[in-house]
Regions:
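A short, structured N-terminal alpha-helical element that caps or precedes a catalytic domain
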Residues: 1-93
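General structural signal for secondary-structure boundaries
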Residues: 27-30, 109-110, 151-152
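Conserved residues at the C-terminal ends of beta-strands
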Residues: 46, 98, 143
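Short, flexible active-site-adjacent loop segments at beta-strand->alpha-helix junctions, enriched
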Residues: 49, 78, 99-101, 133
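Short catalytic/ligand-binding loop motif for oxyanion handling, primarily in non-cytosolic enzymes
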Residues: 52-53, 80-84, 103-107, 136, ...
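A short acidic Gly-Thr/Ser loop motif
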Residues: 88-91, 101, 130-132
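A charged, well-structured terminal subsegment
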Residues: 97-119
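Radical SAM [4Fe-4S] cluster-binding motif and immediate context
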Residues: 117-152
Length: 152
């Protein structure tokens, strides 16, 4: 399974920082890894687009089978817009819709990218200067994820 974006998963990196602040050890794993040198008690899975539902389902099944005792959390655009698709198939999954306010103002844990081949040479930061949007395009997900025109 390939993460379909050239950019790293910013939401997961912010959640990683949030978990580290609670004294939890955090690892970033890309795709379906068969050999992990740790046993997680929480697993976070994200999606960038709704059409990426299949890789999300594959990740849920794969990691739940490997770590049946771990809490599985799914967020991102797919989980926000279509939570019932996940909950109907995987009732054990905790769904998060929208932004995680506790993690919103944290700096992402970019240093975790060093262990992932695709991003090991990542030397950039991603900055959001506003949230929301003043436009009301019928196809756009931004108002559902980030709200209306607050700060835009």
């Amino acid at each position: 399974m390939d993460y379909y974006s050239q950019y790293p998963p910013l939401g997961l990196l912010k959640l990683a920082k949030m978990e580290e602040r609670k004294w939890n050890e955090v690892r970033l794993v890309r795709g379906l890894s068969e050999h992990l040198d740790f046993v997680p008690n929480k697993i976070y899975i994200t999606s960038l687009f709704t059409y990426s539902c299949r890789p999300v389902h594959q990740a849920i099944e794969h990691y739940h089978k490997m770590f049946p005792e771990a809490e599985v959390n799914v967020g991102g655009i797919y989980a926000t817009l279509m939570p019932h698709n996940i909950k109907n198939q995987y009732p054990f999954v905790k769904i998060h819709q929208g932004l995680v306010s506790e993690a919103e103002n944290l700096l992402p844990a970019y240093y975790l990218l060093n262990r992932v081949d695709k991003w090991k040479d990542w030397k950039k930061s991603i900055v959001f200067t506003t949230r929301g949007c003043i436009r009301k395009c019928p196809f756009c997900v931004v108002p559902k994820i980030e709200g209306g025109d607050e700060g835009a």
